[in-house]
Regions:
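Hydrophobic helix-and-loop "lid/oligomerization" segment in the mid-to-C-terminal part
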Residues: 5-265
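A residue-level signal for conserved active-site and pocket-lining positions in enzyme catalytic cores
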Residues: 76, 309, 377
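Short, acidic/hydrophobic/Gly-rich beta-strand patch recurrent on exposed beta strands
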Residues: 187-188, 343-348, 356, 392-395
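Short, hydrophobic beta-strand segments
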Residues: 227-228, 258-261, 289-297, 344
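A common structural junction motif
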Residues: 245-250, 276-283
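OB-fold single-stranded nucleic acid-binding module
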Residues: 266-271, 363-364, 369-409
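Accessory interdomain/linker segments of ATP-dependent helicases and helicase-like nucleic-acid enzymes
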Residues: 292-355
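Beta-strand/loop nucleic-acid-binding surfaces
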Residues: 351-366
Length: 413
């Protein structure tokens, strides 16, 4: 079937919206993703070409996660801390000079958004008695948290199967507080910009595995608050808000993310009721389980394997990149990196392989030189200084012979 010219011309914009909304990359959306990547790689839209340059991304190696962790957060930043119309103008302009100027403006807005969110997250955690975050930077926006430190770090992993937004939403092992120490939900009201409360809620839910609600003043004169919600621990937010609807001015969303307006005078009653509802429903759904798609010896992770994995692209929510249990590594080095990550150098029989464990600062203290380990990882490649090398995005580790995860994903169909 020959697609109309306008469909192909607009596919890049449809792709960005699809990925930013964490829509499943299946069916029509998978076609949108494939066509959108082709259009983005063509460089036909000056605004996006300029934004890719600011993000340090090569057009010919773009992945969906580059969109979700680097491009979408930058476009969203214009509306969160500035004027959303600037992002629209960037996408529509045909003037390369205007595109460069707007991309610079949006890049500054994104840096400002990251700093505002960083400070707000520290304030929110302090008010909830949770202590400072191990990584106070804003987390992945497509996971409902907010593009920031993770977003830029992940640009360095230019993988055939880059890390998925769904994987980024999993709680970071080094930062999660044991369940008995936490309330059933994290509910807080503060004085923050409306545009970032969803980022704060997402990061709290991500770090602590509990539903999080963050509210701020929408209209001081009328006493109206606006709140953003992100789910955790199996709580269906849409259902929970229906059970509180008599207290709300309006509400909307789905099971994992929602929002509402409420009169400030009704906030205490809402908070008490929502905490009660959450206490009844926390854990009603079993937590997500890490899965293994393939067990492979370390020496067999090569470019032939990457090419085979690449046939599954584009990968994303609903069509995740394969998890590999890679066996037979020896630790050469494990060191903490900026943003709460751990960088790894792992030896196999013929050479060494680089790895990065996003939001796993605990691994830097757990692993020692000479440790023999197996890893749960996604395999990709990294291009630096004109050279390409294999790199692993490490999700979990275990002592050699004790695989980090043994539950296999059921075959499709």
């Amino acid at each position: 079937m020959v697609l109309p010219r306008t469909v192909r011309e607009l596919a890049d914009l449809a792709l960005i919206g699809t990925v930013a909304d964490v829509a499943p990359i299946t069916g029509e959306n998978r076609s949108i993703a494939r066509l959108g990547l082709e259009q983005l790689r063509s460089g036909s839209r000056p605004g996006l070409a300029a934004l890719l340059e600011r993000a340090g991304l090569a057009r010919d190696r773009l992945t969906l996660d580059n969109i979700g962790f680097a491009i979408a957060p930058r476009l969203n930043a214009a509306g969160r801390v500035g004027e959303a119309a600037r992002a629209a103008t960037l996408l529509l302009t045909a003037d390369p000079a205007e595109a460069v100027a707007l991309a610079d403006e949006i890049e500054q807005a994104n840096l400002h958004r990251r700093e505002v969110t960083r400070r707000a997250l520290i304030e929110a955690r302090d008010a909830l008695g949770l202590g400072p975050p191990l990584d106070p930077g804003a987390g992945p926006e497509t996971a409902g948290a907010g593009g920031g430190t993770d977003a830029d770090a992940r640009n360095g992993l230019d993988a055939a199967t880059a890390p998925t937004a769904a994987a980024a939403a999993a709680p970071a092992a080094g930062d999660v507080v044991a369940a008995p120490e936490l309330p059933a939900a994290l509910v807080i009201r503060g004085d923050w910009p409306v545009g970032i409360i969803g980022l704060i809620a997402g990061r709290l839910a991500e770090d602590f595995g509990r539903p999080a609600i963050v509210a701020t003043t929408l209209d001081a004169e009328s006493g109206t608050l606006r709140a953003s919600c992100r789910s955790g621990a199996g709580v269906n937010l849409a259902e929970a808000l229906i059970d509180c609807s008599d207290l709300l001015v309006r509400h909307g969303g789905h099971s994992a993310a929602a929002g509402f307006d409420i009169e400030a005078s009704r906030w205490p009653e809402f908070e008490a009721r929502f905490l009660r509802i959450a206490a009844e429903r926390v854990g009603a759904t079993a937590p997500a389980e890490l899965t293994v798609d393939l067990v492979v010896p370390a020496d067999e992770v090569d470019y032939d394997l990457l090419r085979e994995i690449g046939l599954l692209d584009p990968c994303g929510v609903g069509n995740p990149a394969p998890n590999l249990a890679v066996t037979g590594f020896t630790v050469v080095r494990a060191r903490a990196a900026n943003g709460g990550h751990t960088q790894l150098v792992l030896r196999r029989s013929r050479d060494v392989v680089d790895g990065v464990a996003f939001r796993r600062p605990d691994l830097a203290g757990m692993l020692n030189e000479g440790d023999r380990i197996d890893v749960l990882a996604r395999a990709g490649s990294r291009r630096f200084g004109g050279f390409e090398s294999i790199q692993l995005e490490v999700v979990d580790v275990a002592a050699q012979g004790d695989q980090p995860a043994t539950h296999r994903r059921p075959p499709v169909g």
